[in-house]
UniProtKB/Swiss-Prot annotation:
Pfam families: Esterase. This is S-formylglutathione hydrolase YeiG. Its EC number is 3.1.2.12. It comes from Escherichia coli (strain K12). Belongs to the esterase D family. The lineage of its organism: Bacteria, Pseudomonadati, Pseudomonadota, Gammaproteobacteria, Enterobacterales. The gene is yeiG.
Amino acid sequence: MEMLEEHRCFEGWQQRWRHDSSTLNCPMTFSIFLPPPRDHTPPPVLYWLSGLTCNDENFTTKAGAQRVAAELGIVLVMPDTSPRGEKVANDDGYDLGQGAGFYLNATQPPWATHYRMYDYLRDELPALVQSQFNVSDRCAISGHSMGGHGALIMALKNPGKYTSVSAFAPIVNPCSVPWGIKAFSSYLGEDKNAWLEWDSCALMYASNAQDAIPTLIDQGDNDQFLADQLQPAVLAEAARQKAWPMTLRIQPGYDHSYYFIASFIEDHLRFHAQYLLK
């Protein structure tokens, strides 16, 4: 591992690291916020997954999460949104390829060689964080848009791994919206049954009651993508039918930007702290 940056921040440290990923077959970068030490108890971790076109720095520089994370004693880990590099397959569109990994394991050429973000987030990155930093094994997950989709599927596919999950303006039903259809067709092929494994609504309908974890979703009602790409009401209906403990908050006047995330990130951190710090 190589440290790229380090900054003092709210008595803790904001760092950026590069490492060689055996899962993704390329170098990867992640950011981490380490809160000031409180006692001898290792702090829990909140993983944050960003959206289309983003990297590990968007949340770090725009969300303003460090102050509350420092107060609560929560480590923040921000991975990149895809594998990257000259040898990594890409596309001219902003919504496919580098910066648009969709947090799944691709099965189709040319994507399958590198695009295994699901395995990276489930196994390699947490193991690296555990081995290199003083953290506990308690973790939660959150994200925005494509990253909200990522956070939800990570939680739904890995019962017991996370204490809680939250999302801002998530893509909840990718099998049925343009962003998801484009990405899944390329990464997973035309067999739509294979898509269901990566769709939060399908996963929630297939879930077991004992695996449900506290879930918080915020959605701005002035989000330009609300009607055609996001459709949180579809997941809310799945949660209602499954009696899944999910709160969906529609926030009047807010859009899809980091101004929206910055406005409510404190709520999300305090929500996760209830379960992470038990």
